[in-house]
Each structure stands twice: as C-alpha cells, then as structure tokens.
Amino acid sequence: FAKDGGPDAGSELADSLESGDASQAKEVLHRCGAVLGNYHTEVEDVRTTPPDPRRWNARLASLEESLRADLIWRAPFTRDVPCMLSLGDVRLSDTVGQTVRIGRPRIADCLNEPNCEFPAIRDLASLVHDLSRIHHNHGSELDIVELRSSLIDGWRSTAPEDWCSTDAFYAHRGGLAIWEYEQCMLDVIEAVSNQSGAPEPAVTILRHVRGFQKRMFNNRTLGALSIMAAFFGISSVINQFPPSIDELAMPILFFIASVGFFLSYRSLSPPPERPITHSV
C-alpha cells in the first residue's frame, strides 16, 4: 500500500490532542484501524500459517533475558491468531488517507531478530502502543480508553472475522495485552541501545504488568471452580449410571454451576480497550 499525499494520521492525531478535540481524534483513530484491517483482509488469502505459541513465548523469554527483567509472561494463545504477512512496526504516521505504508524495521528487531512470523493482532498492538506514545508525549487529558476503543473498533470493522474475534482478544490467553507487553520491551531495548533514557509510557506500563498478571491469576479461581463442578457432575452421573430422573438433579446442578463459573471467568478478562495501567 503506497503512501499518497496529505497529512499522516500521526500528525492529525497530534493536532486533535493538542486542541482537545475528542471527536476528531476518535475519527482519525477509527480510520487508521479500518485501514489496517483492510490490509489484513487483503493478505488473508495470500499466506497464513498456524499459530506459533512456542516461538512467540520463546521470543518473549529472549526479550526478558536481554533486559534482565524480573517479569515473566507466557500465554497459550488461541487458534484465532494465525501467522500472516505482518507489517511489523506499525505507526500512526504510516497511515495517510486510506493507505498504509510498510515502514522500516525497528532497531529493536535488529538487536533481537525475530525467528518467527506474527499474527495480525500484533500489528494492531503496535498501532495501539503508538497511540499510547503520542497520548503520553502530548500530555493529553482525553480518555485513553475511548481513544483505544475507537482504534480497535475501526480495525474490527474491516479485519477478517476470526482474527478480530472475542477469543483473539481474550487476555487470559494472551490477547492484545501480551503483544503490547512485547512492544514495551522493544521500546526499552532501543532506549538502552541509544542511551536515550527511560522510554515512556513503556516503562510505566511494564511496572503495572505484575499487578495485571496478578489480577488474571486471581480470576483463575473461578476457572478452577468451573472444572471442579463439571468433574463432580460427571462423577455423579458415572457413579449412578444409569441414573434415575431423581438422581439427575444433582449432576444438572453441578453442570449449571460449571457453566456459570466459566462464563464469569471469561467475563473477568480485561477488555482490550483498557490499558494495562488501568486494569490493576
């Protein structure tokens, strides 16, 4: 997608943040998300391969090791995030009108070269993190949650249905958050290489990762209760097989409880529009 004339979206957003024009900022972000989604729809049939959680997790481990970080974040990921022709480092300044350009690889990718392909949601995470940078650099008082929501909604409006599904954004299995975590580590790696000081908001976001993970870990209590209730329901049926009408009451209650606990567990997953810094 070639870059045409006119102001880029990064400049448009910066002007909107400076003037405090929330509606204009949301319009720019929604358009950027839609342009990125259109790109992903165009390349969906060109080449996709199955998700690669082993290499993705190994990359996160490598970045953590490079930074000697005291953080560890791994995820099982979902089937709705296949590898595709990723744009890599995506910035709002890469979008002009209805086009998006392929930018240069970032320095961090040269210092820690990827040995894997990436899903579309990683491109989105790169764009969302660029929004966080611009929002922070301009000291904007506009609600970052609403701005992120506009960008994500724009992407969802044009991206392949499976790639932007609820499961793809499910934070308990990685979602958007874990790729934002990767973007923050890449920012820090570049800052260390350039000796340019602590990069914000990356450093602040990384400080909140542990609390974000703790919240998700605590949510697993409901997941465990769901599994236990299902186990007791199955055990009751097996022990009383073939069960009578009266004997079915208890297993049914266990199964209903299992479904209730599971739905509650899923509902506690942090929504993608809420930043890691707002989820603690």
Task: Explain the meaning of each model-derived region.
Residues 162, 167-170, 174-278:
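ATP/Mg2+ or Mg2+-diphosphate-binding catalytic cores
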Residues 1, 26, 47, 142-149, ...:
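Extended charged low-complexity segments that act as oligomerization/scaffolding linkers
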Residues 6, 22-32, 60, 79, ...:
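Active-site-proximal structural scaffolding
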Residues 109-162, 180-198:
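Active-site activation/catalytic loop segments of kinase-like enzymes and analogous catalytic loops
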Residues 48-133, 201-214:
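Catalytic activation segment of kinase domains across protein kinase-like and atypical kinase folds
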